[in-house]
Amino acid sequence: LLITAYTWTGQLTWDLLIPAIPSTILIGAIMMTNNLRDFANDKAHGRRTLVILMGHEGGTKLLGGLFAFTIAWTAFFAFTNKVPLVVLISSISFITAMKGVRILQSQENTVTMDKAMKFSALSTTLYHVLFTVGLLWSYWGDKIL
């Protein structure tokens, strides 16, 4: 989206960056969850990912921080009236994200940690759907009611 918008307009604006930054972070969080799940295998095969460099515990803390940053980013722009307040409904996705982080903190087997992948992907999807619902609600809500 950002590349297309930049190609068409020759500029990047906050209107495009406000939703794009959390999207990018959440997609990266899915990939980071995969790295955390495969930590032992990746380390044994000499892979040098951010998670390997930080360690399992550090990577898990960073993952939780990324989810929290996404919600804080959305809240900041909602409270500064850059996006409608109703998009804060997307914060519900944080609950699902933290379930995945808790599973990764347990450092059980990879089968158990597969659930963390599910929760990470689900929270990303939920965030985007609820953010979109919030935008649509703010646009059409007054017109329908």
What kind of feature is each model-predicted range?
Residues 1-29, 53-57, 63-145:
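Hydrophobic alpha-helical transmembrane segments
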Residues 28-51:
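Acidic (Asp/Glu-rich) catalytic motifs at the cytosolic membrane interface
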Residues 41-45, 62, 131:
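Active-site-proximal flexible loops/turns
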